[in-house]
Amino acid sequence: MNVKTALKLIVVTVVAGFMTSCNNSRNYDKTSRGTGWDITGKDGGPSYRTDYKEQETGPGLVFIEGGTFTMGKVADDPMLDWNNTPVQMTVNSFYMDETEVTNNMYLEYLDYLKYTFPPSDEKYAAVYEGAVPDTLVWRDPLGDHQTLLETYLRHPAYRDYPVVGVTWIQANEYSKWRTNRVNEKRMEDQGYLVEGARFNHDHGSQFDTEAYLAAPSQTYGGNDSLLKGKKSNKLTEVINNDTVHKYVQQKDGVLLPPYRLPTEAEWEYAAMGMSSTREYNNYRGRKKYPWDGSYTVSGKRKNRGDQLANFKQGYGDYSGVAGWSSDGAMVTNEIKSYPPNDYGLYDMAGNVAEWVADVYRDRVDMKLNDFNYFRGNQYTQNSLNEDGSVELIDYESIEFDTLRTGRVVATGMPGEIKKEEIDDDQIFMRMNFDRSDNRGYGDGDKASSRFYMQEEELNEQQRMYNSPRNSVYAVADSLGNLEMEKDVDDGNRTTLISDNTRVVKGGSWKDNAYWLDPAQRRFYPEDMATNWIGFRNAMDRVGSGSKKGHRPRD
């Protein structure tokens, strides 16, 4: 074999190998890996988004890459609460607000409700009034806080201070509203809604993300003109010779997941910010606070001695000596006044404590679940009309709830899907759940009590947590006028823990340094508010658990 023949054989072998490798690594960006069909919609078949990269970060949020960590207190327990024993836990990647929700952010919500549901109209008065924070939380029988009561929420001097006086229920309603306003603007910006659609303040036709996905043609009360933006006008298909308008679907990747309260596990994981202690696939050491070190003061030269959070430093000492204030605040302080933690989150220790989503129990049971732990699931399903379509709440059927405190709040707004508990069809032959309300699952329900095997009547009487049963009800007088009566349970009680008690995390301006440890936990009734509890939102991460691009490996 001469040299030329050998070279020809080499070239043929290389080309054949190249063609074989190309054949084995087909590009399925525009064709189905299962059928080979076109998936761009050009051939008249189904279309799927093929250029989607990753979830965009919503307004105000920062990305938190999930992982495993030790949840609970890893130091001594001088209070002997024994409610945060350490467990190994994993949380999925998620997003969290960079700061606490501020007065200005919450006022934007109140103004929207005020314009959309004018409180001057008796029918809607409770909508706005039920969302307003309780400013009376600033009162103290032996303190002079009248100025804070009158100015803290609305004065521009406090615009970037964390909102307080908000119940857990109000925080959840704000989260739903924020979800809808963010997605509404995204669709408008991308041409799926008419420009300015978000300023539609017709009280009977509000945009709701979940309702849009289930019944898009009924959004805005069926006002089709608002649903046809520059881009959505092109979303049509021909069915039986009729041109049908197409709407944004989940598969298009346009809509963001809901804003919500973070779970306790997410909040603690994010507050710890363990990335600074990571070495390869392990953590070297522990963290007592969201920052490195065992002290609450900065050791850096430029601000040495300054406190790294806003908290009560001792009896009668909320900020230090005048002219040398170590934390710069008597009560709450402006957001971003202190350095962020490793994830870029501000005020995860101090300023205000924060509501999280979980129902409180005195333990986190790793044996029941060690991934994305959350106590408080209440499964619901969409309520359907007789024709099988989803039932939407309209301005005549706004849902209100009278809390134990006597306050009336709106829990179902026009444009939202009416919800109901899951029925037996969804529970039948299920191995992973068997009820709608799981707040007391494994700790507080009948199945976890020693009376479980006794008579049903006895089961109904027994409660693992002997918490008060207060109620509010209406009584008609001789003229038929309804008056509110409050039934206060004054019996002997052993605990305030119930299915309506929520976890509160983090320290506040009113707490000492003990509560700055992210592992500390306490509880507060979900329908009550105080001047030291605020909140921030979180959002699920869909798709990859890490950001695209280079991942550090050291």
Where are these regions (language model features)?
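C-terminal motif of bacterial Sec signal peptides marking the signal peptidase cleavage site
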Residues: 18-21
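N-terminal low-complexity, Pro/Thr/Ser-rich intrinsically disordered segments
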Residues: 38-54
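Catalytic loop of the DD-peptidase/beta-lactamase superfamily, centered on the K-T-G motif
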Residues: 515, 520-523, 528, 533, ...
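Bacterial N-terminal signal peptides that target proteins for export
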Residues: 1-10
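Functional-site microenvironments in short loops/helix caps that host divalent-cation chemistry
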Residues: 26-42, 63-64, 70, 75, ...
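Short, P/G- and charge-enriched loop/turn segments at secondary-structure junctions
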Residues: 49-51, 81-84, 491, 521-526
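A short glycine-rich, aromatic-capped structural motif
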Residues: 53-148, 159-182, 350, 534-535, ...
